[in-house]
Every structure is written in C-alpha cells, then in structure tokens.
Amino acid sequence: MESERDMYRQFQDWCLRTYGDSGKTKTVTRKKYERIVQLLNGSESSSTDNAKFKFWVKSKGFQLGQPDEVRGGGGGAKQVLYVPVKTTDGVGVDEKLSLRRVAVVEDFFDIIYSMHVETGPNGEQIRKHAGQKRTYKAISESYAFLPREAVTRFLMSCSECQKRMHLNPDGTDHKDNGKPPTLVTSMIDYNMPITMAYMKHMKLQLLNSQQDEDESSIESDEFDMSDSTRMSAVNSDLSSNLEERMQSPQNLHGQQDDDSAAESFNGNETLGHSSIASGGTHSREMGDSNSDGKTGLEQDEQPLNLSDSPLSAQLTSEYRIDDHNSNGKNKYKNLLISDLKMEREARENGSKSPAHSYSSYDSGKNESVDRGAEDLSLNRGDEDEDDHEDHDDSEKVNETDGVEAERLKAFNMFVRLFVDENLDRMVPISKQPKEKIQAIIDSCRRQFPEYQERARKRIRTYLKSCRRMKRSGFEMSRPIPSHLTSAVAESILASACESESRNAAKRMRLERQQDESAPADKQCKPEATQATYSTSAVPGSQDVLYINGNGTYSYHSYRGLGGGLLNLNDASSSGPTDLSMKRQLATSSGSSSSSNSRPQLSPTEINAVRQLVAGYRESAAFLLRSADELENLILQQN
C-alpha cells in the first residue's frame, strides 16, 4: 500500500537520523549489534579504543541466545542478543531479572508494526490498531532498547490512528493518501502520553494558531483586547504551564527505556521546524519537561489547559518577546516579564538571611546596594563552609583583596586563639559550655563586626579540624599555615586583642565601682542587684565605632550572662592592664574587713575572683603563645 510505504520511508529516515551511529543515544544499531555479538564470541581484537565499549557490554550483561534460538536469516545464521532487565510483578515490590531481546534501530518499524496491528489466526492482518499504552507494553515485555518516543512517533504517523484521534481541525477525515498534515505532526510532543485530553488540547491549539494567522494577516498592528482581560489571560496561561512543568513523572518502565528516551530526544528535528504561530516553542517546552520518557498520572486524569494559546505559551516557556508582535502586546509582555523577574529575585533574596543583621540595625542609614551584595556573598560562603567539612580553614581568604582579606585572616586567627585558650578542642561545639561559646562570639562581634555571623560557624569548623587532626596523629599545637597569616593580619590581631583587653578592664572597673556604690540595704539581694547593674552600667560607656570600608559599624555592648559573673572571654583576653583591678580588689576587701569584724565574701564574689584568677592564668598562656607566634613569624620572614 502506498501510504504504508511512505510511512515506512519517513519513519525509517527519522529513526536513522535520531538513533543512528552519529547520535549520542543509548540504542543499538545494526553495526553496534554485530560488534556486541563479535565481542561476546571473542572474535573482536583487543585494542585501546574498545575498552570502554567492552566495559559497557559487560555492565549491561548482554547474552547470546541458546543454540536452538539461532534462526536463519537471508544471509545465513543470525544470533539473537538478549539483555537482562529488572521487572516487577505489579503487586509486590520484589524485583526480578528477565531477559529481553535487543531491538535494533533498523528493525524498529517492523517491531512496532507487528505489535501495533493485530493479526488473525491465519496470519492475515485485522484492521484493528492497538493504543499507545498497549503497544508499548507489548513491546517492553519482549524487547529492550526501544524508546517510547519511537512508539509515539510511529502512532502519530499512522493514518488509521490519526483518523481515530480526530486530529483534523475541520472534523473530516484525512485524504485518501493518509498523510497527516505537517503542521499537526510538528506540534505533537512524542514524549507525552497520547490521551484524549492531550489530543483535544492539540486540536484547540491548532485552531487558535490558524485564527492568529488570519488575524495577523488582516490587522497586524491592532490590539483589541482590554488590559485586564489580556493580563488575566496571560497569567492563567502562565499558571497552567507552570503546573504542567511541576508535574512529577511516574516510573512505569525499565531503566534502559528511560535513558534512551532522555538522550534520544535531542535528535528530534521535526520539533525545530514548527512555526512560531503553531506553538512549536510550547511543544518543545513540554518535551523538555517530560523528556525522560515517563508519563504523569495527573496528565491522564486531568485535561490540560485547553485555552492555552501559542502566543502565551511561547511567552511563558521562553520568557522572551517576539519582535514580530504588535507594540501593544509587547508592552504588556514587558510588564509581565518585569513582574516575573522581580518575584524571582524576591524569592531568591528572601531565602537568604542578611549576613549583618546586628550591625545593620545600628548603621542602617549607611548601608548601600554594594554592601547588600557583599553580605549575600559572605552568607553563601558560610553555607559552603558548613557543607564541606573536609577543609581545615575553609574561609576563602584569597577571594577578597586588600584590607578585607587581611581582616578575614585576623578574624580566623582571633577565633583560633580564643578557642585554644578557652575550649577543649576535642569536644564538639554542641557539648561545649554555652557561656564560653557565647563569650567568644561576643568578642568576635565587638572586634570584627563584619564577620559576626561567621563566628559560631568558624568555631565549629575549627573544632572539627582539631578533632580530625587528632585522629590523623598530627601535632595539635601546629603553627598557623603561612597562607592564612601575614604581617598585616598579625597587627590587626594584636590591635583587636589589645582593644578587647581595654574593654574588659573598663567593664570590670565599672562593675566594681557600681558594686561599691550600691546601697547597703540591697546587699541582702545580691542576685537582683547584679542583674540590674550588669545591664545598665555598661551601655552608656561602651560605644565603639568600626570603619571597614563598607559602612560605619556601631556596637553597644550588652552583658548577656548576668548574675555579676565575669565574662570568661573578657578575662581570657585581659592583659597586664588588668593588674590594677587586682589591687582595687585587695583594697576594697581590706576596707570591708576594717569595717566588719569578720571579712566575708558572697559566693558570687568568690566565684568572680576565682574566674579572675583563671583568666589571668589563661591570659599569660595567651601572651606566651602570641609571643611564640610572632617570633616564628620573624624567623619565617628572615
């Protein structure tokens, strides 16, 4: 029959063009089939170029048929090639392996035709064609490496099936030659399940494209739709297309069909030749969203957007403007595209917390757009630092230049020093004393306000690296790597430590003066008194401005530990300037002993003194460590 010969020629040309040896698809051509057979028989010579091919054949598990399955062909005996495929019985979840015959690309037409057209008891053909699901199910039960896309393409080129699907927009049958219109076949997405809802959608899309062509030929520059109607139509099309793209595929078939259908879709050239008015861009969009060869359950049960016009489909799928449209349409498309971009940027920016929330609260008037961009980049760096635990010092100090890089190095050394002196490096951060962790974070926030959001993550990363180095057997007191330190960073670190020491001394003097000037009648309630002055005495005198090139940072120190307890971080970083406090403590205790016959300190004061003593000892260790590192730096420089 003439129509069948034309159908065979067109389908065969498409198969060779799409699944041929030149295409990067996971299908088996005649040449590849014979090569696999030779490799399994051991007749193919070993070379370096076929090592990858041998590995692929071995991984797939190709097998030759049994001797009784060897059948004679036109040119002699032809061996049958099988491949194991995982299958399920449809009831349980147990998978089993079953052999499927390898389908050759050159035989796709004969295989699909034999499964699609039913035959009678005597071998005669019955004019009864199976549907897409039944055809593909029968093929998948017997063959492998035959993608669903080829089955759908075959059914869409079958004249009998097209008559049954009523694709003709006029409602009449096709011509006697049975050739489908090129416009219809170009609009079909061959990875979509051929359901009645899909066919109705394609029919309406074809009608809309013809109406758009007629209107554009008569009045190309006229825009007769009202503003609200046009925008609502575009928005409805946008939402419908987004819903189609968000539908999750349903896994119905084996892995070899998924790979072949996903990788063979790039060879379908008929989709690229469809005109803009016929909605080719929309069909290409749906093809991309379903290119894995799987069908969505929602697509079988719910009809698609039947009011979807090719013009709006092109707009929503590609987010670009057609230059051939009228000025009025371009105006509303520009508005829609700008709204979409603003919403997308708002969602992206809203998912990230601002990096400097504390400092930007006091210096919000000095913030700029450049500062916001830098904050987001810093925040992304923190997320990477949390994700990758295998880096010892994961701060990207080389990505920034000048003062920022040096301050980042100083910040890293600042955290390392305070962790070494105050925390047990073999204990995770979740099991460390929360007061000590908070004290280190507060100190980092005072001295390096631009990196305040990194403090906790930096502590956690350093503790992880210490535990990892301990397991590896390295020395824990290793020097800081050369790429993480410099002379400028050391000077910044020294300035930060000195500033922290002065601040600690100032806070302790203010607390001691407040304690001495407290009324005698409130001594019976030491807890309440210390809680009040620890939060009221310091803010008025602790206004420190930090200028770092991106804005002015203003920090107001608020004691968060309460109870009159000495800040452990302040005590650990307090240097020799705090020796005057010891003398003040002695004189105050002497005056109290002279006034009272029996000198006695409260438990809170005793605890504060003990912590002060521990702080001085830790400060001495800190100074000794700093001196050793500075000496090592001098030796490295010389």
UniProtKB/Swiss-Prot annotation:
Compartment annotation: Nucleus, Nucleolus
GO molecular function: RNA binding
Amino acid composition bias (Low complexity), ranges on this chain: 588-597
Stretches with biased composition (Polar residues): 229-254, 263-281, 302-312, 351-363
Entry keywords, A to Z: Nucleus
GO cellular component: nucleolus
Ribosomal protein as UniProt keyword: no
Biased composition (Basic and acidic residues): 364-374, 391-403, 503-515
Chain spans, region Disordered: 210-312, 343-403, 503-535, 573-603
Parts of the chain that traverse the membrane: none
Tissue: Expressed predominantly in fetal brain, adult brain and testis.
Biased composition (Acidic residues): 211-225
PANTHER family in alphabetical order: DEATH DOMAIN-CONTAINING PROTEIN, NUCLEOLAR PROTEIN 4
Protein name: Nucleolar protein 4
